Structure formats: C-alpha cells, structure tokens
Amino acid sequence: MVSKECCRNEIRAAIRQLSDRCLYSAAKWAGEQLVGIEQDPSNFTPANTRFQRGSSSIRRRFSTNESISTPLPSVGFSQAATPLPEEDEAIDGDIYLLAKSYFDCREYRRASHMLRDQVSKKSLFLRYYALYLAGEKRKEEEMIELEGPLGKSDAINRELVSLERDLSALRRTGAIDSFGLYLYGVVLKEKGNESLARASLVESVNSYPWNWSAWSELQSLCTSIEILNSLNLNNHWMKEFFLGNAYQELRMHTESLAKYEYLQGIFSFSNYIQAQTAKAQYSLREFDQVEIMFEELLRNDPYRVEDMDLYSNVLYAKEACAALSYLAHKVFLTDKYRPESCCIIGNYYSLKGQHEKAVMYFRRALKLNKKYLSAWTLMGHEYVEMKNTPAAIDAYRRAVDINPTDYRAWYGLGQAYEMMGMPFYALHYFRKSIFFLPNDSRLWIAMAKCYQTEQLYMLEEAIKCYKRAVNCTDTEGIALNQLAKLHQKLGRNEEAAYYFEKDLERMDAEGLEGPNMFEALVFLATHFKNHKKFEEAEVYCTRLLDYSGPEKEKAKSLLRGIRMAQTGFPSMDLEHFPI
C-alpha cells in the first residue's frame, strides 16, 4: 500500500490546486481525508491530534465485519508525487485573480467574461466552469418562476450547447487539461451523452486522480457492474475510494465494506469512511450498529449535517422519537436551510404523525435541491399516508427520473397503485423494485400480495414469491404464515402443516405469541388428529390450553375428539389433561 506520508503530500498539493480552480467541494473532501490520515506519533501536537480523538473505538469495532472478506491486497497503487499542472508553477496573473474573486462572489458571468482572452488551460477551465454555473444559476431561477405541480418545469441550462461545442474543439486540439475534461464530461452527461461523458471523465481521473468531483460524476454514470468493470482506470489509491462508493450505489455492500476496511489502513480517522461504512450497514439493515456509528461521528464532528438524513432514517425506523427530536433541533440550529436539515425535520414530523408538516419540510428540501432523491421518495411516502395517491405517484416518478435504479421509488409506485386497486400496474412496479434489490423479502411479499388480489388471484405465483421471501430472511415471518395459509386454501394440508410448524418454531425462538400462533396450533392439532398421530396432536392441544376464552374451549373440543378417536367412545372426563 502507498505510504501515509506520500498520500499526505499528494492531498496537500491537490487541495491547493482544486481551490485555485474553485472546485471547493472536491477540495473540502480532500481536506477531510488529509486529517483522516493517522499522524506519526513523533509528530503529535495538540493541533494535529484534535481531529483524531474518539474515532478509534468505532474503527476498531467495525473495521472487521463477519460479512466482509479479508482486506484487499495492496496491488499497483501509484506512489508518484502529484503532478503539478504547468500553470500552477507560475504566479496567477492579475486577470485570473480578479476573475476568481468574481467567481467567489457568485458573479459567474462576470468571471467568465473577464477570462475571455486568456489562453492558459487553467484560465480556460475557470472561464467555462463559470459559464456553466451561470447557466445553472439561471436555470434554478427559471424553475422557481415557471414551476408547475410539485415543482415541475422545463427549465434547462442554456449554456450547454455552446459549452459542448467549445470544449469539444479544445479537446481535439489538446488545449484543455484534466479539469477541462472533467467539465466536458459534466456537460456531456447533462446533455444525455453518457458514453462520451464516461470516456471524458475516465481520461480526466487517469491524468489527475485527486479530483473527487470527477470521480463522483463518473460513479453516477456507472449504473451496472458491467459498465463499472468496463472502465479502463489507472491503479491509484483514489480509485479505491471510487470503487467503494460505486459498489455501494450498486448495492454490493459487502464489497463496498471491504474497500473501506482496506482504506482505513491509511485513512484511519476519516469521517467520510465512517459515514460510508454506516451507509453500507444501513443497507444491510444493521440499525443498531449504524446508530452507534453516527453517534460517534457526531461526537467527533458535532456540526456535521451531511449524511445525518440517513441517521434520521435509522432513528425513524427504530421509532426513537426523543433522539430524532434532538437531532432535528440540532441541525435546525446548525444550518436549517440545508436540504438534509429539512429532511431530518420532515422525518421527525412524520414520526409524530403530522404528515402535512412533514410534506412542507420535504418540499422545502426540494426547493433547495431539486435532485434530492430522498426528499422525493419520503414525500411520496407521506402522500401515501395521507391517502393522496396521485401526489404520491407524482413524487415517486420524480425520484425515478433522478435515479432509475432507486428501488424505494419503484416500490412506492407499486404501493400507490395497489392502494388505487390497480394490481396489474402495482405488479409491474414491484417487479422493477425487485430487479434492483432482489434480496429484500419485503419486496417479494408485496408482489405476492398483489398476486393474491381478487383481480389477479394467481395463488401459485404468490406461493413462489413467498418462498423467495423466506429465502431472503423474512424477519417478520409474514411469508411462512402466508405459505401455510395458501397451501391450506389449496387443500395441500401436508405442505400447510410443514409451513405452520416452521412458523411455530420461529415464533417460539423469538418468544412471540398472538393470533398466528393460535392459528398454527389449531391447524396442527387438527391435522395430526385427522392423520391419527394422536401424540403430536395432544402436544399442540395442550399448548392451546394455556390460552383463555375461545382458544381454551377449542382445545378442549379437540382433546375430546382425540380421546374419542383413540378409544372409540365419547370421553366424559378431561381431568387428566392439565386444564
């Protein structure tokens, strides 16, 4: 593996280069990784140890997970020093400094105009980047002015055509560098030319691998493992960060966790890696672990807002109202106009059953970021709770437009159409959700219920779905109970008995009671009595005697029947049974 000192030197140089080009998000990400590198003990000072307190407990606790393979071998990492673009060797010109000042003040067109006669690659990048952001700014203004229901509008970035033309010409002549290639890839992606966009972004990260923004854009274009594997990427430690993120988005969570475990060998105190690990654990539904990790993350970085929306989802799922209330109050005081903050507050109101207020905050999040996927999906859920299915469908469709591989939005569409009594449509959307997440029992159960509706009534298909749900570890036990009932309905009593016994074993192991247990005990007692397996039947009847009311009377009736079947005479005395 590349040395820590080598990584540290590369990142320090990259932060300066990224900041010089106003790529502030990439510079911030790089800075977070810089302080995430474990310091040499000989260099410990109060200044450089402050960022590395407290994280080690989580790192030790979760760096080795049973589901993770052994750390990846240290193969082929580039250890060359950061190449210094030629323009960085000289002092920036006066015009560039003024243009950068305009850019920092969000006067993008003014910055672009100031650089109109500059020919250096650095100046060309900032000129066209400023023009791109000027177009984005105007697009956002038009979206507010022209928006229709749920914020729909036809606003576009009107600079994309000229940007594509100019950047394409500059690329052909070799007049742009890796940063220009990154911008060219972004423009091509916006125009829907994904293949060329990937090629441009790959060229960019291969020539300058420290621009996290370029890696992020490339990851968003890797919608399948086949596309990811087809990329011709140079070996570099930044590639490992990219693959960890890409695997996570492709729902390859074990592989993603393995990458992050490997990277922790150098970036031992990286809050980013800890947050990404928590995301993967969340997808694996390890909510208790995720909660601990986010609590530790907030202790180390108390004013952090990014990724806290995921933490709020965990607290929502665990119905931890007090903790969610505290988190919502905290982010409100920190930065209430961040999309993540609005989403967290929306989750809080949703948990309290105040769905109108929740929708208001999800809408506010979308005002701040129209492409905020979670807000569209969560708003759809709220509309489902409010029985406003047309609005729910609209919200879910917006989520699908942003990310066609988001299983939650497809699942939401299925639920909405199911509520409207349109099982054929619901089935289509449930199938789409299962395509993107085939190992989730909840999706198979939803599709099975669709097959059970009166309009479809395809019980054999429902049985297949419930069997898949059982294989996907149905923690709620819905599938086993339904399999037993469906086989009973179809007159397959042997199969029904098998699944009732399995369900009973599950409930006993979990210490559960309730109607499902009573139903299973009655069926099994009756089934074994009818098959003259009286000892087994008595066992289930005896368990039924522990109930009170109608259940106990049912048990007595069954025991009388068993006694009569055994002796051939009516039983007049049940005192020998533990009633």
Curated annotation (Swiss-Prot):
GO terms for cellular component: anaphase-promoting complex. InterPro entries: APC8 (IPR007192), TPR-like_helical_dom_sf (IPR011990), TPR_rpt (IPR019734). It is found in: Nucleus. One of its GO terms (biological process) is cell division. Disulfide bonds: none annotated. TPR repeats lie at residues 237-270, 272-304, 339-372, 374-406, 408-440, 442-476, 477-510, 518-551. SUPFAM superfamilies: TPR-like. Pathway: Protein modification; protein ubiquitination. Keywords: Cell cycle, Cell division, Mitosis, Nucleus, Repeat, TPR repeat, Ubl conjugation pathway. It comes from the Eukaryota. The APC/C is composed of at least 10 subunits. Interacts with APC2. Component of the anaphase promoting complex/cyclosome (APC/C), a cell cycle-regulated E3 ubiquitin-protein ligase complex that controls progression through mitosis and the G1 phase of the cell cycle. The APC/C complex controls several key steps in the cell cycle by mediating ubiquitination and subsequent degradation of target proteins such as cyclins. The APC/C complex is required for the female gametophyte development and is involved in several aspect of development by controlling cell division and cell elongation. Involved in the control of endoreduplication. Belongs to the APC8/CDC23 family. This is Anaphase-promoting complex subunit 8. It comes from Arabidopsis thaliana.
